[in-house]
């Protein structure tokens, strides 16, 4: 039975799913806006939001936890120095998921995931 199980399987093994969500989180922190399928976008929120909350308090322990989840030094530095300070006053809801129509090949529902207080000077990825 599938009672009280949280999270989506996304038709992947647990290792593949974990690696995919890690890569998507790194891409989101790097570009601050990514395009993906709607179920992946909704699942990505569950990875990104706690990381930004963690980064609000800049300690060595928190940086190590973030590195353990992202495995990218440059992105961890950006998360703690640029992204988290922008969201200091916000009590959650750091990323926005916008529906973006359907993919041509298989009509999969697409979505744009963006950080709420992202810099507008960033070029959009369409």
Swiss-Prot record:
GO function term, MF aspect, one: structural constituent of ribosome
Matches recorded under InterPro entries: Ribosomal_bL17, Ribosomal_bL17_CS, Ribosomal_bL17_sf
Keyword Ribonucleoprotein: yes
A UniProt-annotated Pfam family: Ribosomal_L17
SUPFAM superfamilies: Prokaryotic ribosomal protein L17
GO annotation, biological process: translation
A single cellular component GO annotation: cytosolic large ribosomal subunit
Assigned keywords, A-Z: Ribonucleoprotein, Ribosomal protein
Family: Belongs to the bacterial ribosomal protein bL17 family.
Subunit record text: Part of the 50S ribosomal subunit. Contacts protein L32.
HAMAP family from the UniProt entry: Ribosomal_bL17
NCBIfam families (UniProt xref): L17
Protein name from the UniProt record: Large ribosomal subunit protein bL17
Species assigned in the record: Coxiella burnetii (strain RSA 493 / Nine Mile phase I)
